[in-house]
Amino acid sequence: MNTNNNVYTIIYTTLIVVVVAALLAFVSQSLKGKQEANEKADTISQMLTAAQFGTKAEFQKMGNAAVLAKYAEEIGQAFTINLDGQKVQDLDLEKVFSPKELKRQNYNIKGGANKTGEPEIPVFIFKDGKTVVPIYGAGLWGPVWGYIAFEKDLKTVAGAYFDHESETAGLGAKIKDDPSFQAEFVGETPDFTSANVFEIVKGGAPKDAEGKSLVDNKIDAITGATMTSGGLDAAIDTWLGAYAKYFQGAAPKQHCGNCKHEGEGHDACEGEECDHEHQAEEE
């Protein structure tokens, strides 16, 4: 064959392209399983960190298998809800929501042209009573997301962990890298009746002598990262707003001290009455 003509050049180039494409596809497929496993373990470690079972650094040292084992040991139940706070379906306890899945649900919550269906957002309840929910939104340069854990009362924040794709190192990236920023959320009680469930603002709320916030739901914004702080604030407001009806409905009711359902969730007295008040009247 004449190697100097155009036909040879075209055939040769086509073969090279096909071979290289096949090799790239093979490598990509070979790595896909490992990438998915790493992503799942990372997501779980974020949830465990928010729920105060350890630090992100500690989970990174443990390895994927140990992280999954810890999660299996601590998780109690998982399910999805709609915006009315009603359960849609139970989730396999091994199921987690990747940032890509959170992005899709973010579109569904907000509505508009990118909506793919009705919102179906996850709730993760651990055996110690903490409830963890995700948040997702836009930072300055890319998406930001994270997890917020609540105590049994479903009002008080037990912990939080945030992550990002490409925020500025030393500035916006502090939502992930600065534990003191995440620690500010602990003990706060978001306002589920307001559009501003949390407010991340410069200066935050006034503090007492021990550095504790004197006003609930106000967090000090990161200095030099106004756009990232604002984006995270909007993400938290959007997602916790989407969970508002669930939290308000599932929060433990204030029963009398002698009620057998004291401290339990909203389904505790379903189908029966708490008659302690009537007993007290008879006495």
Show where each model-derived region lies:
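Flexible, solvent-exposed loop/hinge segments and secondary-structure transition points
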Residues: N2-K260, C274-E283
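Cys/His-rich microdomains that often coordinate metals
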Residues: G263
